[in-house]
């Protein structure tokens, strides 16, 4: 019996004392001992064999204190974490909305700059060409200023200096040639006719784009695209018939500008100029600008001569400071609006860019009419409106792809 008692020494009755408090609202170990003692003692007195082993195990199990209840502090921390997670998700959503709003505002600012630079370029350019009828000199100055800006951006690191091979330069050369001719023909037209009329004729760019793509690339347009060209051609014809400043030199110069600019787009697809990582659209435009300057400068020297000098301007009775300042501003706006155009193209789809370009043409036409007080008849306005509506329709239909034929 003593050995049995020794085996259950763990369940000897404790001296009478207050139960041990584990915490607020918790139980003590004393009630468990009072219930465990009679049960264990009864088992021990009945047998010394396997029952004794079971009794010892039972005694150990019954002596374990109950698990402490969840502290109110822990529960509060859990609720706090849940609230914090919800708040973090709400903050992330708010930051995403703010980021989207910031991008929208940035894009709107770029469109505004694109239109503003274009307006000032056309105004200053027309003012200079009106009194200084040497478009090759003016175009050369514009390319020269663009070259200086491009070199400055490369040297200062504003624009990453491109790594370009001789083969790439050779492939870009045809693009530079047609780019040079396109801007030269535009300036020739602006010197002969009103700004509004030049831009009305240039609304026919989609017509030449479809024509040249079909001839050289084999890209046949859909019926809807062809139908959208009808109001463009009809509107330009109607505006030309009623244009007060119409002359054939200005008309054909603007048409030649359309052909050369759209040839540039076709050539870029035909030659498939491969761009390295450092040769983005702005770098490509900068390289073309530099090449255009070196292409046109000898032509200006051999044809018109170097006319844009203080001596020549003064002998012609012109305000030297005014002509040179406006020429410089026109050149800066010329380079700036084209760079901003490429920045917009990197952020939006080509269709959105095309629609923006159509709106830009409307803004330039209206602004030039108001600034220069160009006489415009109702029929002339109607023709311009029809042509621009056709351009907008063309840009919308161009994104529609024909459904594949079922096998």
From Swiss-Prot:
The chain crosses the membrane at residues 104-124, 138-158, 164-184, 207-227, 244-261, 282-302, 374-394. It is a multi-pass membrane protein. It holds the Pfam family TPT. Its main location: plastid. GO terms for biological process: phosphoenolpyruvate transport; triose phosphate transmembrane transport. The keyword Ligase does not apply. Keywords: Chloroplast, Membrane, Plastid, Pyruvate, Sugar transport, Transit peptide, Transmembrane, Transmembrane helix, Transport. It is found in: Plastid, Chloroplast membrane. Residues 1-51 form a transit peptide. InterPro entries: Sugar_P_trans_dom, Tpt_PEP_transl, TPT_transporter. Residues 123-240 form the EamA domain. GO terms for cellular component: chloroplast membrane; Golgi apparatus. SUPFAM superfamilies: Multidrug resistance efflux transporter EmrE (SSF103481). GO terms for molecular function: phosphoenolpyruvate:phosphate antiporter activity; triose-phosphate:phosphate antiporter activity. NCBIfam families: tpt. PANTHER family: SOLUTE CARRIER FAMILY 35 (PTHR11132). Belongs to the TPT transporter family. PPT (TC 2.A.7.9) subfamily. Phosphoenolpyruvate/phosphate translocator that transports phosphoenolpyruvate (PEP) and dihydroxyacetone phosphate. This is Phosphoenolpyruvate/phosphate translocator 2, chloroplastic. It comes from Oryza sativa subsp. japonica. The lineage of its organism: Eukaryota, Viridiplantae, Streptophyta, Embryophyta, Tracheophyta.
